[in-house]
Swiss-Prot record:
Name of this protein: S-adenosylmethionine synthase
Residues noted as binding Mg(2+) in the record, renumbered to the chain: D18
Subcellular location: Cytoplasm
Organism: Polynucleobacter asymbioticus (strain DSM 18221 / CIP 109841 / QLW-P1DMWA-1) (Polynucleobacter necessarius subsp. asymbioticus)
Pfam families linked to this entry: S-AdoMet_synt_C, S-AdoMet_synt_M, S-AdoMet_synt_N
Pathway: Amino-acid biosynthesis; S-adenosyl-L-methionine biosynthesis; S-adenosyl-L-methionine from L-methionine: step 1/1
Domain of life: Bacteria
Disulphide bonds in the chain: none
Record bears the keyword Magnesium: yes
Alphabetized UniProt keyword annotations: ATP-binding, Cytoplasm, Magnesium, Metal-binding, Nucleotide-binding, One-carbon metabolism, Potassium, Transferase
Major location (coarse): cytoplasm
Subunit-structure text: Homotetramer; dimer of dimers.
Reaction(s) catalysed by this chain's protein: L-methionine + ATP + H2O = S-adenosyl-L-methionine + phosphate + diphosphate
Length: 388
């Protein structure tokens, strides 16, 4: 029974203050890339009660109204009323961007080890992961957590539950048997709400309208512990309830804790930053390995040195699920995927304004047309090369 256990992941809605910051950072990145695809962008955002601060390093010839981009993002999320914690119309927006350091630029613009390529924008380690728990090849707990807060947003936006406000969090605990999802044990959903709604009415509506439609029937075995707004009240939320910062939801953004994380956040960073682009490439590799049937679970670690194009290491682990050895899979990866920064950008077509959409509800496991790292177009070649 050593392989029977409980595992939990969480997600947050687009109105969570840290996600507000992520979305503003990525909206600014998109606005710049739309005019200047080779810009260098590291856009950080802080949001608090009535205040947005934009800081970081940007080198570009694009002409972007950063303040208006921030306000538009708040409006699109739903922060159009001071009662919600911040109002796009009246909040203060402070801008404090510098240019990228020339000491960094000289190693990124031209690699020290490869005259035809750009170097990595920083040192670091990144992970990619995929498993066969869902059709999207994602771990089930983070998949369900994302779907719950997505549904909260959907019912808020279409007016079916018009007392919902933008800020919300979800958490799902699954029981695993023999290493596979067996049943849902606990679902937590906390949502910001209007003052007038009673807790009893709120809990009933959240369970029946938000939670139950999301849960897969095959994972419902016996009573589920539903915890809805367990504090009893969640009127004050968003940037008023907590200060939001870019890059503070890196586990929500990735695999919900089911795989390691190298520590680098994604939002606000252009694709020369391997924190983002190599993590996307890692997901692309791992997903294609699993889609090819080479393993039911795949983890890849990639590492880089600043100014150097070629990865300093590539590691593959299939946790004993591989049809061929991990070493052979690693060899196939090196033969089929260009993991140099410029190779990744070309392979995944990353110099496009596609990032705002990634900044809420997960960067992975969403088969959006722009999310090239979710494609499984290399699976057939991997399978053939493996002789399966």
């Amino acid at each position: 029974m050593a392989n029977d256990y409980f595992f939990t992941s969480e997600s947050v809605s687009e109105g969570h203050p840290d996600k507000v910051a992520d979305q503003i950072s990525d909206a600014i990145l998109d606005a710049i890339l739309a005019q200047d695809p080779t810009a260098r962008v590291a856009a950080e955002t802080l949001c608090n009660t009535g205040l947005v601060v934009l800081a970081g390093e940007i080198t570009t010839h694009a002409n972007v109204d950063y303040i208006q981009v921030a306000r538009n993002t708040l409006r699109e999320i739903g922060y159009d009323n001071t009662d919600y914690g911040i109002d796009y119309k009246g909040c203060a927006v402070l801008v404090a961007y510098d240019k990228q350091s020339p000491d960094i630029a000289q190693g990124v613009d031209k690699a020290h080890d490869d005259g035809l390529d750009q170097g990595a924008g920083d040192q670091g380690l990144m992970f990619g992961y995929a498993c066969d728990e869902t059709s999207e090849l994602m771990p089930m707990p983070i998949h369900l957590s994302h779907r719950l807060v997505e549904r909260q947003s959907q019912l808020r936006r279409d007016g079916r539950l018009n007392w919902l406000r933008p800020d919300a969090k979800s958490q799902v605990t699954l029981r695993y048997v023999d290493g596979k999802p067996d049943s849902i044990d606990t679902v937590v959903l906390s949502t910001q709400h209007d003052e007038e709604i009673s807790l009893e009415k709120l809990r009933e509506a959240v369970i029946e309208e938000i939670i139950k439609p999301v849960l897969p029937k095959h994972l419902i075995k016996g009573a589920i512990n539903f915890l809805v707004n367990p504090t009893g009240r969640f009127v004050i939320g968003g940037p008023q309830g907590d200060c939001g910062l870019t890059g503070r939801k890196i586990i929500v953004d990735t695999y919900g804790g089911a795989a390691p994380h190298g520590g680098g956040a994604f939002s606000g960073k252009d694709p020369s930053k391997v924190d983002r682009s190599a993590a996307y490439a890692g997901r692309y590799v791992a997903k294609n390995v699993v889609a090819a049937g080479l393993a039911s679970k795949c983890l890849i670690q990639i590492s880089y040195a600043i100014g150097v194009a070629k990865p300093t290491s590539v590691m593959v682990s299939t946790f004993g699920t591989g049809k061929i050895s991990d070493e052979k899979i690693a060899q196939l990866v090196s033969e089929n995927f260009d993991l140099r920064p410029k190779g990744i950008v070309k392979m995944l077509n990353l110099l496009r304004p596609i990032y705002r959409k990634t900044a809420a509800y997960g960067h992975f496991g969403r088969e959006e047309p722009e999310f090239t790292w979710e494609q499984t177009d290399k699976a057939a070649a991997l399978r053939a090369a493996a002789g399966l």
